[in-house]
Amino acid sequence: IVREISLDGDLGDGSFGVKISADQNLVASVYTYYESQSFRDFVWSTPSQSADELANGPITLNLGGLEPTLSLVSDNIDVVISWTDIKGKVSSTTFHESDFLQWQVPANTRQLSITRTPRGASLSGGALTWRGASGIAFLPLKSGSILDTAAKPISNAATIS
């Protein structure tokens, strides 16, 4: 059975999360169309796996200067997000949210770590989204995911560690 569910309502300009529960296996994705003054682009957002690995420690991502929007979905999001900039300065912030968290990664972030606090529930899923002058890209938080659909920055010696 193939079914299309239209999300025609005004979802705003930002990211959003869709949580699907089923008693059988299913395949799902979200088609997003993006248009700016100079181009048109689209992305198929695929599901991310449940982020149970957060229970065993942080999820760490090497961003190399990219500035995505991080989106997390869970009934009870209670996480500490730490990041290291290209100069080696470490910063962190704690989030206590329900259902959906959207956070813009600061400029010049080299590495990002997400750690669940003891009060937080397992994450239902998460993703990184990039929107900019050259298009849109989506990367689900899945073990082994590799971003290969967006332009990667040219690294210099200061970002290599």
Regions found by a protein language model. Give the residues of each.
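Intrinsically disordered, low-complexity Pro/Gly/Ser/Thr-rich segments with frequent PxxP/GP/PP motifs
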Residues: 1-17, 85-113, 117-118
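Conserved beta-strand and immediately adjacent loop positions that scaffold enzyme active sites
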Residues: 17, 69, 80
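Conserved functional hotspot residues at active sites or interaction interfaces
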Residues: 25-76, 94-99, 106, 120-161
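Beta-strand-rich binding/interaction modules
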Residues: 78-85
